[in-house]
Design a protein with these regions (language model features):
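Conserved C-terminal beta-signal and adjacent last beta-strands/turns
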Residues: 30-35, 94, 98, 102-104, ...
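Small/polar-residue-rich segments within soluble enzyme cores
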Residues: 38
Length: 215
């Protein structure tokens, strides 16, 4: 399928919705192309499903915030045109060996990575373009030569914030007509931290390293 949607208001349509109505003029509709292929078996006592998916996100608008060197004033870094690839496989099984017992399990293995490098511009809390986040100097205009920007080299880096391996097992026993007892166990792995920006006072390029992976 193909989806085109407006970016989120905060950090997308608006540069900093908490303090200003200034519109992000570079924001465009975010696009996603996705397909899924699956196969399932269903018997009286057993259900098994295997799916593979691929999603390509295009023109995402994202933002990051931090404090300038004075540690009192907030800045926002706005990025547009960010792409990402999400792909993986998913397996589900439900078994009912007797009318009183239900067993279930699932496994999801994903590979989610940023798919390009992005250009970021900096703004202060009043949505004024910044020339330097060390001093807080304001640029002459949005997109002007002195408007602080840099290229964020993130192509191939894992997307953070969501576990890319998930597994679960569980069971349910029917003791009486209206009484069930059950237990579930869920396992999360390959969870990568989202990146944070160091105090940064100049333009040029910033190359991200592979984010920290939660043990």
């Amino acid at each position: 399928g193909y989806i085109s949607r407006a970016p989120f208001f905060s950090g997308g349509v608006f540069l900093m919705s908490q303090s200003s109505n200034e519109i992000n003029k570079d924001a465009v509709n975010e696009k996603a192309f996705s397909f899924e292929l699956g196969y399932g078996l269903r018997y009286k006592w057993l259900y098994v499903a295997l799916n593979a998916y691929f999603t390509k996100w295009m023109d995402k608008t994202t933002s990051k915030s931090g404090y300038m060197n004075n540690n009192t004033e907030l800045y926002t870094m706005s990025m547009t045109g960010v792409n990402a690839k999400h792909m993986g496989v998913e397996f589900d099984v439900v078994a009912r060996p007797t009318p009183y017992v239900t067993l279930k399990g699932m496994l999801s293995l994903g590979n989610w990575r940023w798919d390009n490098n992005a250009t970021a511009y900096f703004y202060n809390s009043a949505t004024q373009p910044l020339a330097n986040i060390t001093t807080g100097a304001v640029a002459s205009g949005v997109g002007a030569p002195d408007h602080l920007k840099f290229t964020l080299n993130q192509d191939g880096i894992h997307v953070g914030g969501s576990a890319q391996t998930t597994a679960a097992i569980g069971g349910d026993v029917k003791l009486l007509k209206m009484l069930h007892i059950g237990a579930d166990y869920t396992y999360y792995a390959r969870l990568y931290a989202d990146y944070s920006l160091p105090t940064y006072g100049g333009g040029g390029e910033l190359t991200l390293k592979e984010p920290w992976r939660v043990p």
